Amino acid sequence: HKKQEPESGFLYVVGTPIGNLSDISIRALNILENVSFIACEDTRQTQKLIKRYGINNKLVSFNKHNSFKKVPNLINFLKSGESIALVSDAGMPSICDPGEELIKEAKFVGLNIICIPGPCAAITALVSSGLPSSKFIFEGFLPKKKSEREKTLLEISRNNRTTILFESPTRLKKLLNEL
């Protein structure tokens, strides 16, 4: 006998498409439609996704600018029995986004967390690169400060594993020139 999802008081960490809105699971869509509300990085981005699939659920902004204030409120909603879907603008929440703090706090206070897997930009880049993928390192975003960035790049150059990192489109050209 399978439990019906979503369950009350659960935090659902839901992977979202990273480029093609069709890259989402039926289970993820069911969760997004049936949780109490969706905590999302940018409501405009998430609105595009849920509108595409005819989902009419409340969106709550949860991003790097407001996460410090919102984590306690979201934890209280979960404790009161609400079910929440946490989504990122693209890919898996918590990978270089504020979802990490909510998940950490929910774990700390003993709440139930279920991950609904989905696309991950880092792994997608790795498997399509043709580079060795059995052992790799994920660095996330490089530091913005040049001296710290150079130090990190030097450390990366000393390992013999494929390294994945994120960089914003606006800083990518500058980074490539530094390399």
Label the predicted regions.
Residues 32-38, 111-113, 162-163:
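Short active-site oxyanion
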Residues 8-9, 120-179:
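Beta-strand/loop-alpha-helix module characteristic of Rossmann-like adenine-cofactor folds
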